């Protein structure tokens, strides 16, 4: 069972937290897709496979193989594209409790949250994910349902235009 990280390899992506968590919990393996100045920090780690920049077909292939997506971000992001893609592909997300990540990831339903910057807390979540693969699969199903409910136009346009109609009447 392995996880997946997709993003820019920069300090604010939380790669230091991820690498430290991997040291604390030696059972985890993570595939990393992305490039950037923090690449050297994780390049030699024995349980991190670095793929660099890849095309969308390779991203989707890695998502199909992964048990979860990990987003150890240290910065307040709106809605990271990797989260949306993970949800669309039925992949639960283990994310830092920061910004919109804390709103979109519902612990025990579509993923798990850990305290931003805490390698120890992330290591605990990775260990839990490895210990309960069936629950993670169920969370992936919920993540896919959340994608349909929150991000697809055919679900959201009626809500948006209904609100606009109501606002126009006021």
Listing of model-derived features with the role each one plays in the protein:
Residues 1-13, 19-23:
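Conserved donor-binding/catalytic core segment of Leloir-type glycosyltransferases
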Residues 40-60:
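Nucleotide-activated donor-binding/catalytic signature segment of Leloir-type glycosyltransferases, i.e.
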Residues 60, 78, 83-88, 102-103, ...:
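Short alpha-helical segment that forms part of, or immediately flanks, the ligand-binding pocket
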Residues 64-78, 91:
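Acidic donor-binding loop of glycosyltransferase active sites
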Residues 92-95, 105:
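Short hydrophobic beta-strand element within catalytic cores of glycosyltransferases
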Residues 107-108, 112-119, 128-133:
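Conserved acidic donor-binding segment of nucleotide-sugar-dependent glycosyltransferases
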Residues 128, 135-149:
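A short, well-ordered alpha-helix in the C-terminal region of glycosyltransferases
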Residues 149-170:
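C-terminal alpha-helical cap of glycosyltransferases
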């Amino acid at each position: 069972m392995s996880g997946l990280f997709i993003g820019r390899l920069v300090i604010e992506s939380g790669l230091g937290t991820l690498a430290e968590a991997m040291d604390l919990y030696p059972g985890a393996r993570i595939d990393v897709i992305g490039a950037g100045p923090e690449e050297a920090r994780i390049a030699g780690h024995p349980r991190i496979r670095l793929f660099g920049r890849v095309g969308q077909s390779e991203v989707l292939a890695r998502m199909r193989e992964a048990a979860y997506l990990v987003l150890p971000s240290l910065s307040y992001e709106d809605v990271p594209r990797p989260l949306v893609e993970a949800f669309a592909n039925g992949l639960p997300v283990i994310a830092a409790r920061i910004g919109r990540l804390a709103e979109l990831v519902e612990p025990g339903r579509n993923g798990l949250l850990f305290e931003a910057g805490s390698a120890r807390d992330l290591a605990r979540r990775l260990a839990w994910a490895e210990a309960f693969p069936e629950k993670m699969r169920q969370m992936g199903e919920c993540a896919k349902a959340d994608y349909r409910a929150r991000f697809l136009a055919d679900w959201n346009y009626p809500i948006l235009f209904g609100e606009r109609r109501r606002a126009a009447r006021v």
